[in-house]
C-alpha cells in the first residue's frame, strides 16, 4: 500500500509528465477518493493546501467516491457516480496482512493489538509491532517516516530490556515528509501525541511549499541511498 499522500503526488507527477510531453492540453487528470477532502485526517490546513496545489495544476478532486463496480472502462460509485478512464491508477483499501490477521497477535479487526504508547503486544511482551502492520488500527498514517521513528524507538526499548537500564529516547510522535507533485512540493508536519493518547486529532501544519522543497527532497533522497549501506 502507498503512503496516504501518494494518490495526490501521483496525480501531480502524471500532470507534470503530460506537460513535459506536450500533451497536457489533450488530457484530463482527476482524483477520486473515499475521503471528503485530501488527507482529511490531517485537518483543514493540510487538506486545503493540497487542494490548492491540485487546482493550480488543473486537477479536479472528487471526494466521497466509494467504488463498487469496475466494468467496460468505467468505475461506478456507491452513490451512482461513474468515472470513465483511459488510464486508471487504483489504490486498494488498507487491510491487515493475512499472516498477521491469522496469527495470535490479531485483534477483532485483524490488526495486532498493541500498547498505543510502546507498540508492545500485551499478550506477547517480547513482541513489538510497528509500521503499516498496525498503524491504521492506531489511527496513525501508514507512512514510512512514522515506521522509521517507531523502529528507532522500539530498538531502544529492546536494548534497554536487554541491558536492564533505560538507554533509549521516548517515542516522538511527530512526522514530516515532502509531498512531491512533479514540479512543486509541500512539506507538512503533524504531531500525533493526541492520537496515541486517544484524546483527539493530530495537530498539523504546513512547514514549506515550493519548487525548492522538491529540490531538497531530491538531495535528501540521494544522500539517503548513498549512505544506506
Q: PLM features: what roles do these ranges have?
A:
Residues 110-128, 181-201:
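FAD-binding beta-loop-beta segment adjacent to the flavin cofactor pocket
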Residues 16, 147-173:
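Internal hydrophobic alpha-helix adjacent to the cofactor/substrate pocket in enzyme cavities
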Residues 188-229:
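C-terminal auxiliary extensions adjacent to catalytic cores
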Residues 82-152, 156:
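FAD-site-proximal beta/loop scaffold in flavoenzymes
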Residues 16-113, 165-166:
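A Rossmann-like FAD-binding core segment of flavoenzymes
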Residues 4-7, 41-45, 140-143:
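Short, solvent-exposed loop/turn segments at secondary-structure boundaries
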Residues 1, 34-38, 134-137:
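A short, flexible beta-alpha/helix-coil linker loop
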Residues 1-23, 117:
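Glycine-rich dinucleotide-binding loop and its adjacent helix/turn
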Amino acid at each position: 500500500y502507498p503512503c496516504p499522500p501518494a494518490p495526490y503526488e501521483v496525480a501531480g507527477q502524471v500532470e507534470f509528465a503530460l506537460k513535459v510531453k506536450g500533451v497536457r492540453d489533450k488530457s484530463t487528470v482527476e482524483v477520486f477518493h473515499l475521503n471528503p477532502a485530501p488527507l482529511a485526517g490531517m485537518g483543514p490546513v493540510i487538506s486545503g493546501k493540497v487542494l490548492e496545489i491540485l487546482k493550480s495544476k488543473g486537477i479536479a478532486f472528487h471526494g466521497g467516491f466509494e467504488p463498487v463496480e469496475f466494468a467496460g472502462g468505467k468505475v461506478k460509485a456507491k452513490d451512482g457516480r461513474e468515472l470513465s478512464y483511459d488510464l486508471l491508477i487504483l489504490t486498494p483499501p488498507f487491510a491487515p496482512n493475512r499472516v498477521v490477521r491469522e496469527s495470535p497477535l490479531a485483534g477483532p479487526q485483524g490488526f495486532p493489538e498493541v500498547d498505543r504508547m510502546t507498540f508492545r503486544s500485551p499478550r506477547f511482551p517480547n513482541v513489538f509491532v510497528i509500521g503499516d502492520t498496525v498503524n491504521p488500527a492506531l489511527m496513525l498514517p501508514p507512512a514510512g517516516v512514522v515506521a522509521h521513528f517507531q523502529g528507532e524507538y522500539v530498538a531502544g526499548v529492546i536494548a534497554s530490556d536487554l541491558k536492564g537500564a533505560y538507554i533509549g529516547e521516548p517515542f516522538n510522535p511527530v512526522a514530516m515528509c515532502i509531498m512531491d507533485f512533479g514540479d512543486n512540493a509541500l512539506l507538512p508536519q503533524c504531531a500525533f501525541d493526541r492520537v496515541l493518547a486517544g484524546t483527539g486529532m493530530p495537530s498539523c501544519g504546513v512547514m514549506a511549499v515550493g519548487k525548492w522543497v522538491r529540490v531538497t527532497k531530491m538531495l535528501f533522497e540521494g544522500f539517503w541511498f548513498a549512505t544506506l549501506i
